[in-house]
Amino acid sequence: MAFDRTIAPPQSKLVIGEVLNFPGKWSSYPPHHHSQPEIYYYEFSPQWGYGHGELGEDVYKIKQGDILPITDNKVHSQTAAPGFHMYYLWSIRHPDEDPYDGFTYIKPFETMLDLSLIHI
């Protein structure tokens, strides 16, 4: 769920969303990037659970209450460890000179969205 410019007043300066991540599954996937700064806040069930956040070429172990700032147009995606539900709240700032209007998938992952290319 996202609260973005499609449902917010034009004066809005933030895009806000939340994600419920199933155990062992990816989210914010395929990897993507955008020029605006973003921040993630994480919670887990059970609380001692964890996941991983990819940020560029770095991978961070994410735990209950952690915050992951995303800057510099870095590619990012998230995964919950098996056995742990992960929740995160994310927010992207709308700079006046560069408002958020979506993200860009990186190659070759954008092809994953074209179902005609999947052969089973």
Predicted features along the sequence, with ranges:
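Conserved metal-binding segment of the jelly-roll/cupin
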Residues: I62-G83
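A short hydrophobic beta-strand segment most commonly corresponding to one strand
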Residues: I39-Y41, F84-G102
